[in-house]
Structure formats: structure tokens, C-alpha cells
Design a protein with these regions (language model features):
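Conserved ABC ATPase "signature" region
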Residues: 1, 84, 96-113, 130
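The feature captures the beta-strand-to-loop junction immediately N-terminal to the Walker
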Residues: 32-34
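H-loop (His-switch) and adjacent beta-strand-loop-beta switch element
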Residues: 186-203, 211
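ABC ATPase nucleotide-binding domains
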Residues: 209, 213-232
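H-loop/switch region of ABC-family ATPase nucleotide-binding domains
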Residues: 177-178
Length: 232
């Protein structure tokens, strides 16, 4: 049983409570729920970004996170320097980084802009660099908070294709999503979070069905299902 608490203006609140979860090779877990349910907090606890106040977490394998990708960048350093710096933070050796530098640069499509400090980059350019470096590893466990939506359409399409490849190759996938379609399409398990607790766990279709009935009512839920998910 894991608990994660954080500070608010009124003191300590429980962001996650009574979370018990075990994932094995081949598992693809969708985490769904309303805003403020604790979805992103749970993902960050899994990534060991947030410490827990009670319980334990056991992780076996290399984790890659597709959120907060800008962490670890030096705004005064050039794009090239940040590729190497971020690579080290991702657990790559200097030799491994050098083998990946060219591919990272080509994927980012930043060209000569890699020679200048990233503080001069537009938000779109920075996303290109951060994404290109963060997805250069081959993780055992992939933690993903939605899909990429920022940046120009061409790069977003290319980036989402890479994410799809990583989702297929990772031994374990954990996907936080507001898309019920993605939960069913990509995952074989799902949990519904509400107020930091697991309200429902099981097959994605069953969990999505429960969630839709909870927020919309049974009639609207059945109409929605007939139009989208259960025509597959």
C-alpha cells in the first residue's frame, strides 16, 4: 500500500492513498480519471520523481518518462551540449551518447541552431530538442502522460510515430490519458483513479464503461459506446 502526500495552503493532503499495483512484462496499463484524481502524481511516483510518505516501490528495469522532458537542460548551454548533458541524466554513458548524438540531431531537425544556447530557442524548437533526446533511449518501462501535441504538425506526426514504436517495444507501458480510445487501443489493463484512490481496475473496456457511466449516466454511455469503442 503506497501513500503520497503533498503540501497545500492548508497543510498536508493525501494526493495518493491505498495504491496497490503490480505490473509485469507485457503489461500495458492505462490510468484514467477526472482532473485532480492523482493520475500524473501516480506516474511521477512510479518514476521516483516524487517520494512516498508510506509504503514501498520496487522497480526492475530502465525507466523512460515522456513528461517533464525539459528537466535537466542548461539554458545557457548550446543544443549540442544539452544533448550530452541530458543523455547523462538519462543514464547513458559518454560513449553511448556519442553514438546517438548524430541521430538525435537529425531527428530534431534543428540544424545550425544546435550551436547556440537553448535560451534563444522558441518553445517549439525546445520541444524538438527535449523530445529527440528523451526518446533516444530504449526503455524497459515507458511512462507516458498523453501524446505530444505541441509543435508544428509535421514534427508532431513524426514524434507520435516514434512514441508508438516505443510503446510497442517497451516491456511495460503506463499511459495516463484522457482519451478513452487510446486506453482501449493501446492497453490490456486499466485503472480508474478518483481522489487519489483506485476506484476500478481491470480490462480497459470494462473500466472505461464504468467511468463513462459514472460521469455521463448509463443511457448516454451506451450511445457513446455504440458509436465508437465497441464497433472495433
Amino acid at each position: 500500500e503506497n501513500k503520497f502526500s503533498k503540501m497545500s495552503g492548508d497543510g498536508v493532503i493525501k494526493a495518493l492513498n491505498k495504491i496497490t499495483l503490480e505490473l509485469r512484462d507485457g503489461d500495458r496499463l492505462a490510468i484514467i480519471g477526472p482532473n485532480g484524481a492523482g493520475k500524473s502524481s501516480l506516474l511521477k511516483v512510479m518514476a521516483q520523481i516524487y517520494p512516498i510518505s508510506k509504503g514501498e516501490i520496487e522497480v526492475s528495469g530502465h525507466i523512460a518518462t515522456m513528461f517533464e522532458m525539459a528537466t535537466g537542460f542548461d539554458m545557457e548551454a548550446s543544443g549540442w551540449e544539452n544533448i550530452r548533458l541530458r543523455g547523462i541524466m538519462l543514464g547513458l554513458t559518454p560513449k553511448e551518447i556519442e553514438l546517438k548524438v548524430k541521430e538525435i540531431a537529425e531527428f530534431s531537425e534543428l540544424g545550425d541552431y544546435l550551436d547556440i544556447p537553448v535560451k534563444y530557442y522558441s518553445s517549439g524548437m525546445f520541444i524538438r530538442l527535449a523530445f529527440s533526446v528523451s526518446t533516444s533511449v530504449d526503455p524497459d518501462i515507458l511512462l507516458l502522460d498523453e501524446v505530444l501535441s505541441a509543435g508544428d504538425a509535421g514534427f508532431v506526426d513524426k514524434a507520435n510515430k516514434r512514441i508508438n514504436e516505443m510503446m510497442k517495444s517497451a516491456k511495460i507501458l503506463v499511459l495516463v490519458t484522457h482519451s478513452m480510445d487510446s486506453a482501449i487501443k493501446f492497453c490490456n489493463k486499466a485503472i480508474l483513479l478518483k481522489k487519489g484512490k483506485i476506484l476500478k481496475f481491470g480490462d480497459p473496456k470494462n473500466v472505461v464503461d464504468y467511468y463513462l457511466k459514472m460521469i455521463w449516466g448509463e443511457f448516454i454511455c451506451n450511445e457513446y459506446k455504440s458509436e465508437r469503442y465497441y464497433k472495433r
